[in-house]
Amino acid sequence: MATKSKKKILKTVSVVDISCGNCIKPTFASIFNFFSKKPKRPSSTYRHCHSSISSATPSSTPLATASVAVEKDSDDPYLDFRQSMLQMILENQIYSKDELRELLQCFLSLNSHYHHGIIVRAFSEIWEDVSSAAASAVEASPLITRHVSRASRDYYNYY
């Protein structure tokens, strides 16, 4: 039973993100790949920003103050990039356009050109979701609804 539990833990470790330090290419993952029996596909390895608890670099933006590079093997890089971006946005409360651009630049600078299309697609879909949610919130606002209905009434009474 203890052996089975130990194997389960090792399996989990090989799948978990491995942080490398301060945005430097990690080499720890190569140890797992060396002992792994399945061959590593070069197109499935990528690095992305991931939040960290501590940082020594002072900066004005949350993204720059708490991030490390993480290398991960993935069967679905799009989904992993999207989840990582959403996690960064929520954990660091990234709401401004400048901070979102910084996040995109971080992902693009840390990853090979091979993954840039996937990164931009994931970022674009997140951007569209945020924009449509903001537009829906404005349309559903009682102040906006009352103002629009009064303007419509005035328009029809005028003609």
Swiss-Prot record:
Expressed in roots, shoots, rosette and cauline leaves, stems, flower buds and siliques. Residues 70-129 form the OVATE domain. One of its GO terms (cellular component) is nucleus. Interacts with KNAT1 and KNAT7. Transcriptional repressor that regulates multiple aspects of plant growth and development through the regulation of BEL1-LIKE (BLH) and KNOX TALE (KNAT) homeodomain transcription factors. Plants over-expressing OFP6 show flat, thick and cyan leaves, and enhanced apical dormancy. This is Transcription repressor OFP6. It comes from Arabidopsis thaliana. The lineage of its organism: Eukaryota, Viridiplantae, Streptophyta, Embryophyta, Tracheophyta.
